Amino acid sequence: MFDAGLPVALVVSDRPCRGLDLASDRGTAAELIERTDFSSSFDRDEYTHGVVSVLGRHKIDVVAMAGFGTVLGQSMFDAFPQRVINTHPALLPAFPGWHAVRDALAYGVKVTGCTIHVATPVVDDGPILAQEATPVEPDDDESSLHERIKHIERRLYVETLQDILRRGFVLASPDQEE
């Protein structure tokens, strides 16, 4: 997103990652809100409140999620209604969840791809903004297919975010449609 010239105001991650380093190198605010509790008693609402607080402090308008590994609670979507964008390595609604590429291969699909969508409290279930397909090659394994999808996903995500910035909104209300 940095290389595409998108205005990145803040990078937040739930674990140490390259994105935090890139932000720091470019003088962009970066926050690690690490999830340390992986027990069944994990307080998702408390964690989400922390994320929403950080985003609010930085006056964030649109949240572009990429690789954020913690499912966030309802307060995220209340604070940013229809303004949390996510990417997924499958053609939703097919193969939602963490193992989309593996699931697509196991099912035997001949075509898969990626989806850019509005995130909601239900994982991988929001309105679809963009999709792009790619064939599954005979010699593909999970790694090779996922790499090809990620290449498409990065480009499509940037194009979708640029379109959102150009239009000034994520989803059109009936009076905004062209």
Q: For the regions a protein language model found, what residue spans apply to each?
A:
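One-carbon transfer enzymes
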Residues: 1-178
